[in-house]
Design a protein with these regions (language model features):
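Structural recognition of the beta-strand scaffold that forms the well-ordered cores
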Residues: 1-2, 58-62, 93, 118-121, ...
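Residue-level "edge-of-site" marker
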Residues: 4, 98, 123
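Structured C-terminal subdomain patch of bacterial secreted/periplasmic proteins
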Residues: 10, 14, 113-178
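Alpha-helical, coiled-coil/dimerization segments enriched in small aliphatic residues
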Residues: 71-103, 155
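Short helices/loops that flank or line small-molecule/ion binding pockets
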Residues: 104-114
């Protein structure tokens, strides 16, 4: 049985291993390998697009909590998302590990973001995010003042397999290349 949150090692590598197992289990091993090659090619293209940003820090965030108690999930170093950031030649913009690959924090914690902040949120969180970004506390954040916040499309999924990983890498590269 696959473990979506391995206690050690890379969640990215675990995703690849699990994908290969699934492809073999359904008799589509060759197709699975082609998808993984597409993933490798996609990451290489995104890394090339980000060459001028190599070594810069990028923190990935998504909304958490509720509209009445907003919170932010920061993806930690042991997440698949942070692993992709590193594979693109960038550095983690959020430190620490968390059991499920992200830590839920309040707005004030964003003051620790040094570098870029990529905010990923689906349309149903628009109101919550709007409420956060309109506050004076948000507007005073160093990363906001430096105009280093980017949003990725609402259909970007951060917990999936190869195809969603490709979409995340492509959108991150496009947003940071603007």
């Amino acid at each position: 049985m696959a473990s979506p949150y391995p206690s050690s090692g890379s969640q990215f590598n675990a995703m690849v291993t699990d994908f290969r197992r699934l492809a073999a289990a359904v008799g589509r091993k060759g197709r699975g390998e082609r998808v993984l090659q597409d993933l490798s090619n996609s990451l290489a293209r995104a890394k090339s697009k980000l060459r001028s940003k190599a070594g810069q820090r990028v923190a990935i965030a998504t909304p958490g909590g509720t509209s009445s108690a907003p919170a932010i999930r920061m993806f930690s170093q042991n997440s698949q998302t942070a692993d992709v950031v590193r594979r693109l030649g960038l550095k983690d913009g959020w430190t620490g590990n968390a059991r499920y690959g992200f830590a839920t924090v309040g707005l004030e914690a964003l003051s620790r973001v040094n570098g870029w902040l990529a905010f990923v949120y689906p349309p149903q969180f628009e109101r919550q995010v709007s409420g956060i970004t309109k506050t004076s506390a948000y507007k005073r954040l160093p990363v906001v003042k430096a105009k280093r916040v980017r949003t990725l499309g609402g259909t970007t999924w951060l917990f999936g397999g190869p195809r969603s990983t490709m979409l995340f890498a492509d959108r991150l590269a496009a947003s940071l290349s603007r």
